[in-house]
Amino acid sequence: MSDSIPHPALSGRRVLIPGGTGGVGEGAVRSYLAAGAQVVVPTRSKERAEEFRLLLGEAATARLHLFEHDYTDFAGAEALVATMVDRLGGVDDVVAPIGGWWHGKRLWEIDEADWQAAFVSLATAHMAVLRAALPRMTRQGAYFIVVGEAAHVPIPGSGLVSMEQTALQMMHQVLAVELQGAKRVFLLELGPVATRFVEAVDPAQVTSAQIGAVAVTASASTRPGSSVRLLNRAQAEEALVSLGAAR
């Protein structure tokens, strides 16, 4: 993946990106590394970590830290963040493109395994990372909850995805009220994303590189937390201009 988007300097910032090995996460990892940050990405295995390092190529500098950690439950996320604090001294920013896609059944056709996999497990992973990382984050940083278009568009056969994504939207709203500006939390609302997994890319689609650039620019800015719509390439370009002006 090529990325010619300029990034503000974030030298010394310590960034956690659970889900960083995925298509959207890759863009965030590349962008924060390009900005000079220390980037922590949890992986399921050493083999997966090596595959991701090879994928990144020259972008995988010494500032990339691949931790073999399962962060999908409360204990695992707590251990991950504790390890990051122990090794890097703290946490400044978190970008959480956690999740996947699920399709195939109408709501009344699902079984308990579907419910656990497509709703409970993903919501738990987001909550686990948030509760472990947010209290430890510095005030200069930002937390990014990442959701897809299913959060506000009902998709037949993928209702559990829409329900889980909408829950994350409410998580962001509750955090805004509870934090009262003490720390910054952004909600990135994505449309269809052009990633390494997409063969036929629509030129109007937002790219993972743009999403990463928006997160980096928001991290570097003084803009309070907010909801940022990145449903297409044009909205991403507008967000970069708006957030850049707040630096």
Outline where the language-model segments fall.
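Conserved glycine-rich cofactor-binding loop
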Residues: T21-G22
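Conserved glycine-rich Rossmann-like NAD(P)H-binding loop of the short-chain dehydrogenase/reductase
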Residues: G36-E51
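N-terminal Rossmann-fold NAD(P) dinucleotide-binding loop
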Residues: G25-E26
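Conserved mid-core segment of classical short-chain dehydrogenase/reductases
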Residues: G99-Q116
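Flexible N-terminal pre-Rossmann segment of NAD(P)-dependent oxidoreductases
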Residues: M1-I17, V241-R247
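Rossmann-fold cofactor-recognition segment
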Residues: L56-A75
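C-terminal helical subdomain
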Residues: Q173, Q180-R247
